[in-house]
Amino acid sequence: MTGQLRLDDHLQRYSETAPHALAVATAVDAIAAAAIEIADLIGAGDLADASGLTTGRNSDGDVQRDLDVQADAILRRCLGKLSIAALASEEMREPQIGDRAARICVAIDPLDGSSNIDINMTVGTIFSILPAPDDLALAFHQRGSAQFAAGFVTYGPQTSLVLTLGDGVDIFTLDRKAGCFRLARSAIQISEAGEEFAINASNRRHWDPPVRAFIDECLAGVEGPANHDFNMRWVGSLVAEAYRILTRGGVFLYPSDARPGYGDGRLRLTYEAHPMAYIIEQAGGSASTGRERILDLSAQSLHQRVPLIMGSSNEVRRVEELHCDPLLVASISAPLFARRGFFRL
């Protein structure tokens, strides 16, 4: 692995390409340094008192674990040394305003999937880098298409950094001996059609009819309109699901549903859906709410939630088509629809 391109060399080349590029490269480098520290903390587990114990709830009401707090502190310390106009985090109620003359704003989910810590499953860090507007009150109300860069880190069997700087997607793997990230895969492309779908099927009774119809088509396999079989996956970690899609294709669905608190979806637009959608599109895939392109949306509040369907473009397009089907749309209020399908008799 020693002969492969180092992340810092990759960022050095990029830093000379545009007026904002140096600021973006410096922020990515700081996030990578924080990720190495977080990876060590997670890897030590209980030996380093890095437990998945809950410490309360964050500002948006989600369960907050000790590692969420520690990861947030590490990232804020590393990014706090830089010239950044505004910083937003899942663990913060409001954005932190910094250098008003800076060119960039950064949004982070310090530790996505932290509920998986207890069972030793993959967790990660997600980040989005945006231009700094003249009015910093609007810093995190921009469309997703405005992003300069986005990425995520997976802490699993390998520690990997998935990165787009607006010109394709590359994957860097942590070289633990050298203490740096090195290029492992470049110019990632998601297959147009996938053979896997990921959704929490236990919530089927709560889904809207278009989502149920799509999953029923997947389950019908070669005997249905898709004309090929699917496998089902569900990890419960957004970074793990996204990494699988980038490397194997397929589609991930976290739709809105009828449960209290899930009517607008569950994932946050600014620091989860936006960066993931940017990465997926840069790799040739698609990302949608089922009705709208994720990157066309602008957040009305920092912690706004949205549905997210992302992955191979054929499958995402089919979900959107079903959301436009007048019969399915009309049946959303029809209770008997819930009795149909492969999971109900």
From Swiss-Prot:
Locations listed in the record: Cytoplasm
SUPFAM superfamilies reported for this sequence: Carbohydrate phosphatase
Annotated Gene3D superfamilies: 3.40.190.80, Fructose-1,6-Bisphosphatase, subunit A, domain 1 (3.30.540.10)
Cofactors: Mg(2+)
Pathway annotation: Carbohydrate biosynthesis; gluconeogenesis
Catalytic activity field: beta-D-fructose 1,6-bisphosphate + H2O = beta-D-fructose 6-phosphate + phosphate
Residues that hold Mg(2+) 1 according to the record: 90, 109, 111
Main location group: cytoplasm
Residues given in the record as Mg(2+) 2 binding sites: 109, 112, 272
Assigned EC number: 3.1.3.11
GO cellular component, one term: cytoplasm
Keyword Magnesium among record annotations: yes
Keyword flag Magnesium: yes
Entry similarity comment: Belongs to the FBPase class 1 family.
Protein name listed in UniProt: Fructose-1,6-bisphosphatase class 1
Organism: Bradyrhizobium diazoefficiens (strain JCM 10833 / BCRC 13528 / IAM 13628 / NBRC 14792 / USDA 110)
Gene name per UniProt: fbp
